[in-house]
Amino acid sequence: MEFSVKSGSPEKQRSACIVVGVFEPRRLSPIAEQLDKISDGYISALLRRGELEGKPGQTLLLHHVPNVLSERILLIGCGKERELDERQYKQVIQKTINTLNDTGSMEAVCFLTELHVKGRNNYWKVRQAVETAKETLYSFDQLKTNKSEPRRPLRKMVFNVPTRRELTSGERAIQHGQAIAAGIKAAKDLGNMPPNICNAAYLASQARQLADSYSKNVITRVIGEQQMKELGMHSYLAVGQGSQNESLMSVIEYKGNASEDARPIVLVGKGLTFDSGGISIKPSEGMDEMKYDMCGAAAVYGVMRMVAELQLPINVIGVLAGCENMPGGRAYRPGDVLTTMSGQTVEVLNTDAEGRLVLCDVLTYVERFEPEAVIDVATLTGACVIALGHHITGLMTNHNPLAHELIAASEQSGDRAWRLPLGDEYQEQLESNFADMANIGGRPGGAITAGCFLSRFTRKYNWAHLDIAGTAWRSGKAKGATGRPVALLAQFLLNRAGFNGEE
């Protein structure tokens, strides 16, 4: 779908459809009031007759309104004006896109971006409208042979901004929104792909294709098991021993700043393309969803695509830690003691706590890049789901300024995170009689002890950990990958690059 931005009066628009808001109870938005005045009270008369209350989700399509050049006007219920927040705004946009498609509109001029959303500027409203529109239209049907094509005639959406001064920020918002939406789609597509197709080799092929598409400043290197062995990544290798699919680590390097002292930001994504639990095997119910255990790597891939598309003037490295955790004659066992790349030893008490065993070696590997910061993204613990549910990502870090940056980016993007503690007292739960540490610390504070485990491998740089176990995918009727936290990380990198969304 094509997006553009303009500034103009609603009555002068020659379009198939104009979209304006109506508040509860039967209150016209400022733009709707202009149209009502031009049409000699036509719209307000309809509202007085009870045609539309303005409740969220309500719609009313008007044809050939007097003195209005556009063929149709779509009135969208926005709820109570003072209660219009970010979440409600996105729901209004979603309802708009679905209604326009259902009613056969091929193009529309949308004035909803002029609604007042507390604390949000026009850049934010336009960008979120683009991202929400793309999200609304997303479907994953690549593997279906009998595809039912939904009715989607809408091809062009024009967002109106109040004055010409905001056109530049509006155009930038569309550019950013489309790049972020494409990154989210890429992450969702990878996450939704079945594990018999999406293994570590498939992740590597996607990483190579990204380098081919943006060859000017993207390089991809794939590190196989033999190289991992030479590097001493025995913990990473142990997790994949039971699988016939080779473990592969894909390193995507984007260089947007040629300065010698420009240190990279490193993103590390857990890429367990299927996690059976290994010898500590999971229950069969819901095990199919363990294809989503690579959503951290999928998110990193999506972010790298966004960075390359926007040609951000920073250096970013994305690592996709591809692996598969399966039971078998060669699988690692509870009781094994592994020597990590850092030289520290780990007693395996549960083979289903495997993500941290992969990540710890990758976190050691990335020291060679002398990073400005390292952020790992992982569907790491069920404990984080218990703590925060399915709405907010867990954040842990060894660096307060980095925490503040990420929390701010999560608020800006609407892809929210919440900081969990990382106190020394939790480290005691990882003590082992037979190694430097155990790979689990018991049930209490399980998300935090997992973060504590990783923190032991991140002492040489500023580091943050995002536990997306509760936010990476949805179950039930709307089952599928969410693409989170692509939006959060994209905003973080946009801020680092100087594009903080201020007008």
Swiss-Prot record:
UniProt-recorded name of the protein: Probable cytosol aminopeptidase
UniProt keyword terms in alphabetical order: Aminopeptidase, Cytoplasm, Hydrolase, Manganese, Metal-binding, Protease
HAMAP family named among the record's database cross-references: Cytosol_peptidase_M17
UniProt similarity note: Belongs to the peptidase M17 family.
EC number: 3.4.11.1, 3.4.11.10
SUPFAM superfamilies: Macro domain-like, Zn-dependent exopeptidases
Organism: Shigella flexneri
GO molecular function: manganese ion binding; metalloaminopeptidase activity
Function as written in the Swiss-Prot or TrEMBL entry: Presumably involved in the processing and regular turnover of intracellular proteins. Catalyzes the removal of unsubstituted N-terminal amino acids from various peptides.
Cofactor(s) the protein requires to work: Mn(2+)
InterPro entries, per database record: Leucine_aapep/pepB, Macro_dom-like, Peptidase_M17_C, Peptidase_M17_leu_NH2_pept, Peptidase_M17_N
Catalytic activity: Release of an N-terminal amino acid, Xaa-|-Yaa-, in which Xaa is preferably Leu, but may be other amino acids including Pro although not Arg or Lys, and Yaa may be Pro. Amino acid amides and methyl esters are also readily hydrolyzed, but rates on arylamides are exceedingly low; Release of an N-terminal amino acid, preferentially leucine, but not glutamic or aspartic acids
Broad class of enzyme this protein falls into: hydrolase
Gene: pepA
Positions bound to Mn(2+) 1: D275, D352, E354
UniProt remark on cofactor binding: Binds 2 manganese ions per subunit.
Superkingdom as given in the UniProt entry: Bacteria
Gene Ontology BP terms: proteolysis
Binding locations of Mn(2+) 2: K270, D275, D293, E354
Subcellular location: Cytoplasm
Active site per the UniProt annotation: K282, R356
Annotated coiled-coil segments of the chain: none
Family matches, as CDD domains: Peptidase_M17
Residues annotated as signal peptide: none
One GO cellular component term: cytoplasm
